[in-house]
Amino acid sequence: MLKTICVKTNNKEISKYLLKELEYFEVQSIHVSSYKFKVYTNVIIHYKGKNIELFLNKISTLLAYLIIDFYEPSIIQNLINTNYFYFSTEEKKDIYNLCLTNIDFKTSISIINIISEAFYEYFFYNKYVVLDGFVNFRLKNYIKELDTVVDMCVNKFIIDREYNEFVSLLKAYIQTTPSNADAIHLIYKNQNSILLDNSKNAIQYNDILINSKYLSDISFSSNDYALNSLLTLLPKKLYIHLIDVEDDFISTLKRIFGNRVYICTECDLCALYKSQTSKYNLNRLKN
């Protein structure tokens, strides 16, 4: 049984890519030829085997990867320019780069399946395909998937921008405001903060320390009051005793307080709180 497919493109790089990939095509019994006309280059694949479904499946997957390599960047760029035209050129570039890095493995598999299924269904009833037209009119679900990725990345970009503005404002405030404490110790354990003064006595989060003007839309949940207290006290040195791993809150403190921050993981204070954690975990296992 003979099955013929003709792929039409006016992009030289696409035709070269397709011909090269077909040299290593996994399906036997195919003959490939290429003809250049005034508008399009036609890449023609003749299949003389018996397993038409396998042939269509493999050629559809090959074309799906081709679409991702050659069309996806411009589709993403067009979606950004159309839906988010009010961002600056530099901001659009940042959003575009975010999109490229945020298409994870799961999303990639989903996208490949969407495109290959569209080609598979199309080739059951058609012998030739114009790639530009196919992308514009037959891959609506694919473009919708990319639109979702762009929306997600725009939201992430806005949140990151607000976060960076927040950090910059606080850094400027710290640099222009006198310190109210020589040193503060912050014990960071189970994503919660305990503040100690220079004598290692506990600092209470009371109304005297809390100044609402330092509160921000950027929230660290239970650590908001710790951050506010630090912004009120403005220590010359901030010793962070990491009982657990460093997370976003600690990274933010390092950005805000800069060279005032000293990370510690092995002092007597660290050992004390680590031993308390170990005893707690041991008691939980016994119970």
PLM regions: where:
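Conserved mixed alpha/beta catalytic, RNA-binding, or beta-rich assembly cores of soluble enzyme
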Residues: 1-224
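C-terminal structured domains
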Residues: 199-287
